[in-house]
Amino acid sequence: MADLLWQKPGVAVDAQIQTFLAGDDVILDREFFLHDIAASAAHAQGLQHIGILSADELAGLLRELEILAQDFREGRFVLDTQYEDGHSAIEARLTERLGDAGRKIHTGRSRNDQILVATRLWLKEKLLSVAQLSADVAKVALDRAQAEKDLPIPGYTHIQRAVVSSAGMWWAGWAEAFIDNAIRARDTHALVDANPLGTAAGYGVNLPLDREHTTAALGFARMQISPIYAQLSRGKFELAALEALGGATLDLRRIAWDLSLFTSAEFGFVALPAQYTTGSSIMPNKRNPDVIELMRATHASVAAARTEIEQLLSLPSGYHRDLQSSKGAIFHGFGRGLAALELLPALLANLEWRDDKLRAAIDSGMYATDVAVEAAVAGVPFREAYKAAAAGADSAGQGRTPEGSLAARVSPGSAADLRLDELRARWQALS
């Protein structure tokens, strides 16, 4: 491992202890590395503004940071275990190429605010992905709700047949859910859109750092003013981001559950495209919906990441090395969550309803609620109407059709009044 930034003269470093301390930090830092480089460039500009760096030194640093970013993207620079972490790698590279200018770049900066700002930039990027993917899912659902608004399907409660429903209602439900998920991701993006760079180790420094410049240069909406709060927000903001992602993966889990049921032979309501299924290694007849099953499992990874960070945050104020473990949690949670969400729009766009199976699953008893409500409208107290409809549930469907039941469902949001224009207006407001 290269020289450690914090190593004191005459003090030996125990290799086993150092390996434990570093953990997989340098590997995880590959996710942050380009953001760390961008923040280093903004910090260098700020140092030049207050006279720590000359114009020539700044020009050299900016040039070498750009070269480093390009080398990293193209595989010529590998962030590996010869470095303690990504921050050390940047400083080592700049020092190797530029000498004293490289040694100056850490002036007024701690690895504490360095990882904070890189993480914050990464979270902003991922939250925008959650928002966009949620909007994409909502768009597919809205389009299919419009196209299939009159297609009858059975509605379930307790996984038991309940009332006549429609594909339009089913799709509209997911459309509104994912519109809300997009809104939540954007709201969380606004929360984390605060620049912690310049708070150093959590107590500021005796330099007039140009934090307004770094805030603008890095595209933050505002400065995170308090150095104490900058450290308190580490983990807190990651947790908020995972909660926003979790809203989307929670709905993903439930839609995957619906599709797991609907594609089974016992239901047979939906046919999945072949590319979303796999076979069995021993049973030649099998066509397994592995994609939706793994989608269903995704929320567990997001929830586990959230739980890990919640437990890490049992800490007093100030920086603590425990927080290093938050990196792996957010990478795993967002890695699994976004990968699943990326597949969802195309899956939903290409699934096919089986009309004959849907209609066959609508039985006479599913009209009993219609019978009770109609009697109540005619003046029968609802509880009496309910009892009469329950007694005659087996014959409630006589003379009735699924289409007639849906046409009568006029309460706002129901089959005859889906309010798709209102939902589409909310979706359009996302852009």
Curated annotation (Swiss-Prot):
This is Argininosuccinate lyase. The keyword Plastid does not apply. GO terms for molecular function: argininosuccinate lyase activity. NCBIfam families: argH. InterPro entries: Argininosuccinate_lyase, Fumarase/histidase_N, Fumarate_lyase_CS, Fumarate_lyase_fam, Fumarate_lyase_N, L-Aspartase-like. PROSITE patterns: FUMARATE_LYASES (PS00163). It catalyses: 2-(N(omega)-L-arginino)succinate = fumarate + L-arginine. It comes from Stenotrophomonas maltophilia (strain K279a). Its EC number is 4.3.2.1. It is found in: Cytoplasm. It comes from the Bacteria. Pathway: Amino-acid biosynthesis; L-arginine biosynthesis; L-arginine from L-ornithine and carbamoyl phosphate: step 3/3. Its main location: cytoplasm. One of its GO terms (cellular component) is cytosol. GO terms for biological process: arginine biosynthetic process via ornithine; L-arginine biosynthetic process. It holds the Pfam family Lyase_1. Keywords: Amino-acid biosynthesis, Arginine biosynthesis, Cytoplasm, Lyase. Belongs to the lyase 1 family. Argininosuccinate lyase subfamily.
